[in-house]
Amino acid sequence: RRLGTDRIDLYQAHRPGFSVPQDETLRALDDLVRQGKVLYIGTTTFPAWKLIEGLAVSEKLGLHRYVSEQPPYNILERRVENETLPLAAAQGLAVIPWSPIAGGLLSGKYPVDGSSPKGSRGDAGRQIWKARISPSGRVAAAKIAAYAESRGWIPAEFAFAWVKDRPGVRRRSPVPGPRSTWNSPCRPSGKA
C-alpha cells in the first residue's frame, strides 16, 4: 500500500541470508506470488551456488522459482562471467547488472592522483568504497576513460554500453545508479 501499487512486478531477495534456510525464504516469496502481491521473484548479489540451491529447492517443493539475478558487473568487476552468467543462461534467468560504472570509478571523475570530488563515494571514507576506488582501480579506469574519449564516448556512457552489450545481459536491463549527472551514462551524446 505504501508503494501505491496493487502488486510488485519483480521482488528481489537482496543478498542471501546464510543463516536462513532457502526453503523458508522461498516459501515466503512463493506466498507473495500466490497472493497476487508479486508477479516474479529474483535475487540480487547471490553467489551462483546459492542461486542453484534456490532453484533446486523451488523445483523440489513446487514453489515459484527465481527468474533473475542482479549482480555487480562492470568492465573492472567481471567475476560473474565465471559462474553466474553461464548459470543464468542455462537456467533461463535474466541478468540485471548493477554498478555498471563501478560506483562512479568508470565515470572519469576519480583521477590517478588519489583525490576524490567532494561529496563523492570516494570522499565518503566508507571502507567498501576505499577498496573499490583503489589506486590500481583508478589507473585502470583512467586507461578505460582515455580509450573511450579517444573514440568520442563519455567514459560512463562507454562503461554502461560495455555492460549492456555483454552476452547474457538483456540490453535494457543494467541499473545505472548514478548519484549525479556527472556519473550518468544517460548524458547527451546518444551512444549508450
Task: Annotate each predicted stretch with a short phrase.
Residues 1-79, 83, 90:
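Glycine/proline-rich, positively charged
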Residues 6-8, 94, 154:
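Short coil/turn motifs that cap or connect alpha-helices
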Residues 16, 49, 63-66, 98-99, ...:
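Tryptophan-centric aromatic hotspots in well-structured domains and transmembrane helices
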Residues 33, 100, 124, 130-191:
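Conserved short secondary-structure transition element at the edge of the structured enzyme core
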Residues 39, 94, 170-173:
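Beta-sheet entry/capping signal
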Residues 47, 73-77, 99-106, 162, ...:
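Glycine-rich beta-alpha junction loops
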Residues 58-62, 85-87, 112-116, 189-191:
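Short, hinge-like loop/turn segments at secondary-structure boundaries
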Residues 87-147:
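Glycine-rich, positively charged active-site loop/lid region within alpha/beta enzyme cores that binds
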